[in-house]
Each structure stands twice: as structure tokens, then as C-alpha cells.
Amino acid sequence: MNPTTSGSAVSTLEEKNLGRIAQIIGPVLDVVFPLGKMPNIYNALVVKGRDTVGQQINVTCEVQQLLGNNRVRAVAMSATDGLTRGMEVIDTGAALSVPVGGATLGRIFNVLGEPVDNLGPVDTRTTSPIHRSAPAFIQLDTKLSIFETGIKVVDLLAPYRRGGKIGLFGGAGVGKTVLIMELINNIAKAHGGVSVFGGVGERTREGNDLYMEMKESGVINEKNIAESKVALVYGQMNEPPGARMRVGLTALTMAEYFRDVNEQDVLLFIDNIFRFVQAGSEVSALLGRMPSAVGYQPTLSTEMGSLQERITSTKEGSITSIQAVYVPADDLTDPAPATTFAHLDATTVLSRGLAAKGIYPAVDPLDSTSTMLQPRIVGEEHYETAQRVKQTLQRYKELQDIIAILGLDELSEEDRLTVARARKIERFLSQPFFVAEVFTGSPGKYVGLTETIRGFQLILSGELDGLPEQAFYLVGNIDEATAKAMNLEGEKK
């Protein structure tokens, strides 16, 4: 990582390599430069001037193609309203650079690294270009290790890999945001790490809601902004495709600085990775490339790879990425989600059925998967416990139809015991979150992996068969469940 320390991201404006706009097609500009002064691919170009009404214009573009005849084709990072042919264009001589480091925490940025939260300027002495190659093999940390989140259902059944990529699947209103905020909170407390949130092509309202909830839950500290645990980068639905295509790289660049220079563990959230592909598809068509399968860009897997390969563990620190995945028309074979799946180490699937039952986090224990759940990685004890939990829940799922029609009494003794334990497991998979304290009033719990395994082993062994199932609902470790059972017993008397 070689961040530059300069007063401005635009370093060579003094030399002023000037061109002029020759053609504008929506967010794509063709610019003519003097002979021998052609900018490089990915150079940032700046258009400054006034529109026909006299309003100041300041549009940054990125060079995508060199067309010949001293022409380049560039994609705008903001709206091209008011631009006219013949306007002056300045070649900055460098790629887009964004602020990095502690100054970014608690702040909201756009794709260019400009703050958009009305909290004043950001210290831009340390900036970093958004385009760079993935770390070399020799720098990578190849040791497979679990990233403990303190969330029981995740750590036991679909553990995250340190420096891995996790797909987050779930519809609206099943608790994606709260789960994301809890992960941000836990990485800061347990791992001394920070988080970067990249809002890629999603609703502006949701971005605003997330910001407000983060302030309310303390993830962003309003009184002392430097104490915040997260930096936010947004390029939402209303932005041109150039911004939506690059905002993921802006967020990743900020995360890389925390990993490589501060040597921290970083969580990078991308919401939504599908919109990154969608924006690339729009830009590809505007640049005149021949579309590939289902109308996507021919460079789909290259673009995805160049983003995903930068998300990894090095010997300095790690970037663990959690990516919300929108599946168009629920078609998992669509090229966009199919290309994403090739990069994922784990999937966390949120279930509306569990949310309706009031079991939070509403992570589906049977649908969520992880490549880390192997005995040689997590150990025999963890693996065996996870498999037995899944078998018990699977059997309960199979018996539900019989229970619905005939009732519990028609089941065999063994099946009744399985159902009772499965219901306890289901409730024990819920837990109170720190970030939800404000709403629920019950204090949050971080449960270590060994405690989680011990708790489920006790339920499976039958030692806790005598306890009522509500004792297992929204508690931390198993000792709290037994204490809650005693309280319930006392209340009955």
C-alpha cells in the first residue's frame, strides 16, 4: 500500500494538460487532447466551467478507452447536466484518489471521497488511488482461521473465514441492518477492528436510515466522531452508472489502508454487490462493447475478480467482507449472482419465517452454509455439534406437517423428544444484540465459540430436557438459560 501524502488528490494541475469535450452521450464523454498529450487509462479528468445559466460546474470523469485520433472516452462520476461541447477538460495525471485513515471514521463520503454529511471538510493529507492490484501471493496469509463474531448461530453453523467473503441473503424487514450493525459493534469490541460500509446502488432512504440507526446505537459517536467504528461510502440509485461502478472500489481502498498501514482487522460491507455488476453493465453498453449472456458486460468476471481479489488476509491484517446479494427474479443461475457465488466462502441466509416467530437474528440454520465447517479446520467437537444441531432441526422440519395435521400426541416418544430439543435449540439460536438494547431494553451478549458449543452440547445430551423452552429464548450462554429457568420457576410459585 503506498498512500500519497499531498494537499490535493489532483497533483499535476500546475502543468495543466488540457483537452476539450467533443461529444457527450449521457454519462459518457469523448474528449480531444493535443498530439502526444494523451491521458492514461483510469486517469481522472476534471471538467470545470459554467453552464448556460451561469451555474458553476465541476464534473470528474475517468478515462476508459483511448479511441485514436487523440480522442479518449471517459465515464462521468456525477451528472453531466449543463456540459456542452468545446468545454475545457483538465487531465489530472493520476487515478481518482480518496482520503484514507482515521479521519474517515464516522463520516459519509461519495465516490470521489468528498464528505456529504455536512460536518465540514475531512483531513485529506493522506490519500490513496482507488485502482491497485491485489496483494501478491507472497504477502497473503494462507492460514485458514475462523473469524469469531460472538453471534451463536453464525459461529456454530456457518462460521466466517478471517479474510473471507460472505454473502448475505434476505428480503426486506428480516433484520439485515441490525445484523450488520451488530457485526460492526462486535469487531470493534472483540478484535479492535474497524468497518467500512459501501452503499452501492441501493435506496438513498435506506442509507439515511442506516446512518441514523448507527448514531442511535453508538456505532457512530456523534460527540467524539473519532471514536466511531465505521466509515460510510455511498453511491446510491440516483447516481450515474460511473459512480455506482466505482463506489465499491472507494470503500475497498479505505478498508485496505486500515489493513495494510494500521494493521487492523477490517469488516467491509457491500450493499449491494449485484448493483456493482449492474452499473458495470450500463457503462459497458455506453462504451459500445458487445453484450454477453443475458445482456451483461463481456468483462463481467474480470470486473468482479479485480474487486474480490483485493479483499483478502495479508500478513499485516485482514479484510473480511460481507456482501448483500440481490438475486434478480430469484434466479440463482443469472450471471451476476452466479459470478458472485464463485468468490464466496460462506452464506448467511435470513428467514422471514424465523423473523415472524420473533427469533432474532433470523438466520436460517439449515440454509446458511460455510466452507469453513470442516473437522480439519474447526475441530471435531465443533463439527460434530453443528451436524447434530442441523440433524435435529431437519428432523423437526420433517415432522412439522404431521404435527400440524395430527398434533404432537401422535408422535413416537423419540420424535417428541427430538421436537422438544429442536424447539429449545431454535430458541437458543436467538440472542440479544448490543445495538438493539435501545429498542429492546435487554443488554446485548457476546458469546464466545467455546461457550456456544458447550451450550448446544448440553441441550443435545438431554441434560436440560426438564427446563421450559422459553428459558432459552433471547439469552447469551447456557448458564443464563438455566438461571432464567429458575426465575420462571420462582415466578410460578
From Swiss-Prot:
<keyword id="KW-0547">Nucleotide-binding</keyword>
<dbReference type="InterPro" id="IPR024034">
    <property type="entry name" value="ATPase_F1/V1_b/a_C"/>
</dbReference>
<dbReference type="InterPro" id="IPR055190">
    <property type="entry name" value="ATP-synt_VA_C"/>
</dbReference>
<keyword id="KW-0472">Membrane</keyword>
<comment type="similarity">
    <text>Belongs to the ATPase alpha/beta chains family.</text>
</comment>
<keyword id="KW-0934">Plastid</keyword>
<dbReference type="GO" id="GO:0005524">
    <property type="term" value="F:ATP binding"/>
</dbReference>
<dbReference type="InterPro" id="IPR036121">
    <property type="entry name" value="ATPase_F1/V1/A1_a/bsu_N_sf"/>
</dbReference>
<keyword id="KW-0150">Chloroplast</keyword>
<dbReference type="InterPro" id="IPR005722">
    <property type="entry name" value="ATP_synth_F1_bsu"/>
</dbReference>
<dbReference type="InterPro" id="IPR020003">
    <property type="entry name" value="ATPase_a/bsu_AS"/>
</dbReference>
<dbReference type="GO" id="GO:0045259">
    <property type="term" value="C:proton-transporting ATP synthase complex"/>
</dbReference>
<keyword id="KW-0406">Ion transport</keyword>
<dbReference type="GO" id="GO:0005739">
    <property type="term" value="C:mitochondrion"/>
</dbReference>
<keyword id="KW-1278">Translocase</keyword>
<dbReference type="GO" id="GO:0046933">
    <property type="term" value="F:proton-transporting ATP synthase activity, rotational mechanism"/>
</dbReference>
<protein>
    <recommendedName>
        <fullName>ATP synthase subunit beta, chloroplastic</fullName>
        <ecNumber>7.1.2.2</ecNumber>
    </recommendedName>
</protein>
<dbReference type="GO" id="GO:0016887">
    <property type="term" value="F:ATP hydrolysis activity"/>
</dbReference>
<dbReference type="GO" id="GO:0042776">
    <property type="term" value="P:proton motive force-driven mitochondrial ATP synthesis"/>
</dbReference>
<keyword id="KW-0375">Hydrogen ion transport</keyword>
<dbReference type="Pfam" id="PF02874">
    <property type="entry name" value="ATP-synt_ab_N"/>
</dbReference>
<feature type="binding site">
    <location>
        <begin position="170"/>
        <end position="177"/>
    </location>
    <ligand>
        <name>ATP</name>
    </ligand>
</feature>
<keyword id="KW-0813">Transport</keyword>
<keyword id="KW-0139">CF(1)</keyword>
<dbReference type="Pfam" id="PF22919">
    <property type="entry name" value="ATP-synt_VA_C"/>
</dbReference>
<dbReference type="InterPro" id="IPR050053">
    <property type="entry name" value="ATPase_alpha/beta_chains"/>
</dbReference>
<dbReference type="InterPro" id="IPR003593">
    <property type="entry name" value="AAA+_ATPase"/>
</dbReference>
<comment type="function">
    <text>Produces ATP from ADP in the presence of a proton gradient across the membrane. The catalytic sites are hosted primarily by the beta subunits.</text>
</comment>
<comment type="subunit">
    <text>F-type ATPases have 2 components, CF(1) - the catalytic core - and CF(0) - the membrane proton channel. CF(1) has five subunits: alpha(3), beta(3), gamma(1), delta(1), epsilon(1). CF(0) has four main subunits: a(1), b(1), b'(1) and c(9-12).</text>
</comment>
<dbReference type="InterPro" id="IPR027417">
    <property type="entry name" value="P-loop_NTPase"/>
</dbReference>
<keyword id="KW-0066">ATP synthesis</keyword>
<dbReference type="InterPro" id="IPR004100">
    <property type="entry name" value="ATPase_F1/V1/A1_a/bsu_N"/>
</dbReference>
<dbReference type="InterPro" id="IPR000194">
    <property type="entry name" value="ATPase_F1/V1/A1_a/bsu_nucl-bd"/>
</dbReference>
<keyword id="KW-0067">ATP-binding</keyword>
<dbReference type="GO" id="GO:0009535">
    <property type="term" value="C:chloroplast thylakoid membrane"/>
</dbReference>
<dbReference type="Pfam" id="PF00006">
    <property type="entry name" value="ATP-synt_ab"/>
</dbReference>
<keyword id="KW-0793">Thylakoid</keyword>
